[in-house]
């Protein structure tokens, strides 16, 4: 879907210097959120996602990955963040997060993300935050290192039809 017709741009951040976490906290009035990342990290690893600064063991995730010659799957429960698609240190990777029903206060929160890197693989992930609170803060960690200078993060809102 084209940006502007369905997606409403909320905020874009392009890093002028490396940092460990990128946060968004000014969004409201949408049904779902889309967070698009294009970047690299200082230590090849999987970025992490947290909501409302919750660092408790309230997150679970699963993934399915493939590289053209093999496939793998895995996951974990009771984690302190949602693990998401792996990024490298030099080849730009892309991750698209779809945060479903983020403001609903009667259901746990789910996120679906897709990730790709030209030198590696494609992966689909699903994550769960076991909390019914509306999401008011999104923290995207670099997975143990830093997001490199030039990495770009764009948050979009989606209105229900």
Model-derived regions, located:
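Surface-exposed molecular-recognition determinants
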Residues: 1-161
């Amino acid at each position: 879907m084209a940006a502007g017709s369905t997606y409403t741009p909320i905020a874009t951040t392009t890093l002028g210097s490396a940092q460990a976490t990128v946060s968004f906290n000014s969004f409201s009035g949408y049904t779902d959120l889309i967070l698009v990342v294009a970047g690299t990290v200082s230590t090849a690893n999987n970025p992490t996602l947290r909501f409302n600064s919750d660092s408790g063991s309230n997150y679970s995730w699963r993934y399915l990955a493939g590289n053209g010659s093999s496939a793998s799957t895995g996951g974990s429960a009771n984690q302190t963040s949602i693990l998401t698609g792996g990024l490298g240190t030099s080849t730009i990777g892309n991750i698209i997060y779809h945060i479903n029903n983020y403001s609903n206060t009667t259901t746990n929160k789910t996120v679906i993300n897709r990730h790709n890197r030209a030198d590696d693989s494609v992966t689909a992930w699903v994550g769960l935050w076991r909390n019914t609170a509306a999401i008011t803060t999104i923290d995207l960690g670099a997975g143990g290192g830093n997001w490199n200078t030039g990495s770009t993060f764009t948050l979009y809102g989606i209105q229900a039809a």
